[in-house]
Amino acid sequence: TARIKDLTTGELLPDVIPGTLSSLIWVAGDTGIVYSLANEQWRTDNARLHWLGKPVEEDIELYHEDDEGFRVGSGLSANEQWLVLSTSDHETSEVRLIPAADPLAPPILVKARQTGVEYEVDEREGTLYILANDTHENFRLATAPLGDPGSWTTLIEGSDSFYLLGVDLFRDFYVVEGRLAGLDQVQVRYYD
């Protein structure tokens, strides 16, 4: 069960969301919350939107996953401009983006799921940064324009010796995390 507290006054708001099994993601200028409910198998198969001050019965389902083997997760892009809805099982993933300022806007599907392909997405200044295992089991880092999210261009090739674990985007640079010969590595790289 999720409850909301006003940290400036210490007051608990009347909003109570029972059955949540996820983090709460603030959207729409902190007037809405995206969350997931647990289904009968204790999996998150949905992403829902709750407007503060409205009854929970009026919450809107933003996404529902029909495949019982997949779980739904939500988060924000590093710049907090995009709600990132991901659905995945142990070997396959699919990501949709929704403007965080307008969570009722139609979602943008980055790439339709393909069995065995896992990917995650972040966005900076109209460019998507995609960590994916579509061309190499140790993942690659690709980019794509937000307006054409399926057109991936490799930025860092997949490698037998370097396992890409993650990428974090910042204003002036990005950080690549990985393993080289079993040792953790962090690389700071600049855009352009």
Identify what each model region corresponds to:
Residues 1-192:
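Peripheral, non-catalytic segments that deliver or gate enzyme domains
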